[in-house]
Curated annotation (Swiss-Prot):
Its cofactor is Mg(2+). It catalyses: (2R)-2-phosphoglycerate = phosphoenolpyruvate + H2O. This is Enolase. Catalyzes the reversible conversion of 2-phosphoglycerate (2-PG) into phosphoenolpyruvate (PEP). It is essential for the degradation of carbohydrates via glycolysis. One of its GO terms (cellular component) is phosphopyruvate hydratase complex. PROSITE patterns: ENOLASE. It is an enzyme of class 4 (lyase). Its EC number is 4.2.1.11. It comes from the Archaea. Mg(2+) binds at residues 250, 291, 317. Pfam families: Enolase_C, Enolase_N.
Length: 425
């Protein structure tokens, strides 16, 4: 019987990509990586509202296939080019592999091969390495200090580009921050989600419980206050207090900015007026966090709100796009106080971890996030624990591409046992 050498255990022996479907029925990239004694499979998410500074997601633009949204070019870039470069490399050398792909691509936004191609390999490499070593992915990525479970921030009312209603704000979220364990937090969130369904159905009819891309309800609500009132009622109906479950907003404000003013709740507001608008909401409702409250280039306005709302988590998503250069600018200007981490915005695991490290070194919170078009891949759950993320944003406790991430966190909490700690905000 031939025994495999220690070095060969971790050597990449095969890389294969394919086109699969995401949760919105559009194609995405899936990558398999085989080492001498391990295997990793990863699939890449996609966003609906995207920052203009994100790494490029390569689409075929062939109108005869999937309305131009096919990803066969990205798949071919893996199978015909990148795979040959990776064969024989040690899967444990994550940064070396990521930097090689970046260098081979040769562009700032990864447009040569596509960030969806590069990220698929980057994710699958980490999974294959962990499997080869026989350790959990969160432990492989995070080391011995990975033991904190993030607070889930659950998108339970969808608006903006995530729904077909008239709400300007894209996401209304609940955050069971008062739980003592992640499993209890998930239960509290699910109970409140179901209570919200009843509140909405009683007020707006059965159609109000239709769901959007991320599992949240998409009721016929047109004002921010009506949505927030429904959340407050649901929290009370579920038997919880505002100190136990807070509210988060994702404005995705670039989507309702006309270059001069913001169109929200039927009004056009100048940036200074929008600051006051948010401050009024914070005063009235138990709002813990606001994501992308202004246009993605409005660093000064982010800084103004961060200064005024000093005890609120102001999250930069399109503002930072998980990019260390944009994040460094935000830190210097004191624009926002939290990073939204989306691995497909930047395109590699190494660069994502660099952004998280920079944020945390400067006192910024980190929120690990899904995208509106997801797959059954659960890696962001492991990443959240690995980096010590404060919150995880992965949709409502509904639709299996969302609950897959929550269920993975339950498994991680179980694996950690008595060492598990639930983040306190």
């Amino acid at each position: 019987m031939n025994s495999i050498s220690e070095e060969a255990k971790y050597t990449i022996q095969k890389v294969h990509a394919r086109e699969i479907l995401d949760s919105r029925g559009n194609p995405t990239v899936e990558v398999d990586i085989y080492t001498g004694c391990g295997f990793g499979r990863a699939s890449v998410p996609s966003g609906a509202s995207t920052g203009s500074n994100e790494a490029l997601e390569l689409r075929d633009k062939d109108a005869d296939r999937y309305n131009g949204k096919g990803v066969l070019k990205a798949v071919d870039n893996i199978n015909k080019t990148l795979s040959k470069e990776l064969l024989g490399m040690d899967a444990r050398n994550q940064r070396e592999i990521d930097e090689l792909m970046i260098a081979l691509d040769g562009t700032e936004n990864k447009k040569t091969f596509g960030a969806n191609a590069i990220l698929g390999i980057s994710m699958a490499t980490a999974k294959a390495a962990a499997d080869s070593l026989g350790i959990a992915l969160y432990r492989y990525l995070g080391g011995t200090n990975a033991f904190a479970l993030p607070v889930p921030t659950m998108n339970v009312i969808n608006g903006g580009k995530h729904a077909g209603n008239d709400l300007s704000i894209q996401e209304f979220m609940i955050q069971p921050k008062g739980a003592d364990t992640f499993s209890n937090a998930l239960r509290m969130g699910a109970e409140t989600y179901h209570a919200l369904g009843k509140v909405l159905e009683d007020k707006y009819g059965a159609s109000a419980t239709n769901v959007g891309y991320e599992g949240g309800y998409a009721p016929p609500i047109s004002t921010t206050a009506d949505a927030l009132d429904a959340l407050v009622s649901a929290i009370e109906e579920a038997g919880y207090t505002e100190s136990e479950i807070s509210i988060g907003l994702d404005s995705a404000a670039s989507e309702f900015f006309d270059g001069d003013k913001y169109f929200i709740d039927g009004n056009k507001l100048a940036p200074a007026e929008l600051v006051d608008y948010y401050l009024d909401l914070i005063e009235t409702y138990p709002i813990l966090s606001i994501e992308d409250p202004f246009h993605e280039e409005s660093f000064e306005d982010f800084a103004a709100l961060t200064s005024e709302a000093w005890d609120t988590i102001i999250v930069g998503d399109d503002l930072f796009v998980t990019n260390v250069n944009r994040l460094a600018k935000g830190i210097e200007m004191e624009a926002a106080n939290a990073l939204l981490l989306k691995v497909n915005q930047i395109g590699t695991i190494s660069e994502s971890f660099d952004a998280a490290n920079l944020a945390q070194r400067n006192g910024y919170s980190v929120v690990v996030s899904h995208r509106s078009a997801e797959t059954e891949d659960t890696m962001i759950a492991d990443i959240s624990v690995a980096i010590g993320g404060d919150l995880i944003k992965t949709g409502a406790p509904a639709r299996s591409e969302r609950t897959a991430k929550y269920n993975q966190l339950l498994r991680i909490e179980e694996d950690l046992g008595d060492a598990a700690r639930y983040v306190q905000l």
